[in-house]
Amino acid sequence: MDWGLAISSHPKPYSVTTGGNLWRSKHTTKNIYFASSWISKASRHKRETQIEHNVLRFQQPSLDHHYKCIRGGSTYQECNRKFVVKAISKQPLGFEAHASNPKNILDSVKNVLSAFYWFSYPYTMIGITLCAFSSSLLAVEKLSDISLSFLIGVLQGVLPQLFIEIYLCGVNQLYDLEIDKINKPHLPMASGQFSFKTGVIISAAFLALSFGFTWITGSWPLICNLVVIASSWTAYSIDVPLLRWKRYPFVAAMCMISTWALALPISYFHHMQTVVLKRPIGFPRSLGFLVAFMTFYSLGLALSKDIPDVEGDKEHGIDSFAVRLGQKRAFWICVSFFEMAFGVGILAGASCSHFWTKIFTGMGNAVLASILWYQAKSVDLSDKASTGSFYMFIWKLLYAGFFLMALIR
């Protein structure tokens, strides 16, 4: 043993314990015995230093024990002297860390992915993806148009738009940090899951990815789409003179219309028409119906998105439609816009040349309009959870509307 002292029982022993335990000594006479030799009182401090050093080197599979040390030789008294021992066990602690690492890593990955999910507003990303597919299918004239190159063309439009959406979500949360602590405390920036620096890095990275990817494709419809959307929604969020457009209800509504009714469907259609299918530029009737449908629907979205957030918007001077008109009035106006959008869908279906397409799209939009009206009557405007749930519900109706509008010919 490399302590150099005998270990046995003593009526009042020193004890060594783990986790910051103490050596205690109370007015007792103890014998220090080192390798059968007597040590002088003068060398006591030197030997105690060696003992403490050797205790730190002492390794056992379990550290949760008490060890008793006999001191022989010279006698002395110690009054309330305490020695703190930091027990170090390399092998057991290393083994425990190794055993727990996989679980800890998995939990960390899950937490990061969950935070990123809420950071990126997944409901808008689903809407963008379905809008891209719906608009792209309007360019299809015959079944042979749907090929591998067609699917690649759709992805060329979807991926950069998803990247720019993550950038825009990040910018909005960076500038709405204090508002979101009231309106949306579950968001990762407001809750503290992501730091401000992390938000900046994520936003900048996805902005670069979006424009870089689109530039590689060389599609001018997609490049123009990104420029319009990135510039308008950046101006919507950032708090600098003449910008922060979300403070002005009319301008905020124009941002919504320019994105969802104009930039997205028109750019996706012309990307597929001119870049992928190599056909001349055009503006068919089906695209006109989709633009009209999305104009009314995006107006409804512009009004309804701020209804659950009235409290925080009032406190921070955001003059939204819901703040200006009141929740009830703004709510029923937005419901009217949604119903108008489904009315456009019914007219589009009625204009179709194919009988079954006419029936399916016309009846489908009528069913969606009925479901919307039924759901709207059950909303409690005084309950933030109820209004928030309705807002997510109208996005689901939009998803269904995209499928129906893709069939218009």
From Swiss-Prot:
Q: How does it sit in the membrane?
A: Multi-pass membrane protein
- Give the subcellular location: Plastid, Chloroplast membrane
This one is known as Glycinol 4-dimethylallyltransferase
Describe how expression is induced or repressed: Upon treatment with yeast extract.
User: What is catalyzed by this enzyme?
Assistant: (6aS,11aS)-3,6a,9-trihydroxypterocarpan + dimethylallyl diphosphate = (6aS,11aS)-2-dimethylallyl-3,6a,9-trihydroxypterocarpan + diphosphate; (6aS,11aS)-3,6a,9-trihydroxypterocarpan + dimethylallyl diphosphate = (6aS,11aS)-4-dimethylallyl-3,6a,9-trihydroxypterocarpan + diphosphate
Query: Would you tell me the Gene Ontology cellular component terms?
Result: chloroplast membrane
Q: Give the co-factor note.
A: Magnesium or manganese or cobalt at a lesser extent.
What family does the entry list? Belongs to the UbiA prenyltransferase family.
Pfam family example for this protein?
Answer: UbiA
**Cofactor field:** Mg(2+); Mn(2+); Co(2+)
Known EC number:
2.5.1.36
Q: Which Gene3D superfamilies match?
A: UbiA prenyltransferase
On whether Ligase is a keyword of this UniProt record, the answer is no
Major subcellular location class = plastid
Keywords for the protein's UniProt record, in alphabetical order? Chloroplast, Magnesium, Membrane, Plastid, Transferase, Transit peptide, Transmembrane, Transmembrane helix
**Functional description taken from the UniProt entry:** Proposed to be involved in the biosynthesis of pterocarpan phytoalexins, specifically glyceollins. Can act as a prenyltransferase towards glycinol which is the direct precursor of glyceollins.
Ranges annotated as spanning the membrane: 113-133, 148-168, 200-220, 222-242, 249-269, 287-307, 330-350, 354-374, 388-408
Pathway listed for it? Phytoalexin biosynthesis; pterocarpan phytoalexin biosynthesis
Q: Which segment is the transit peptide?
A: 1-44
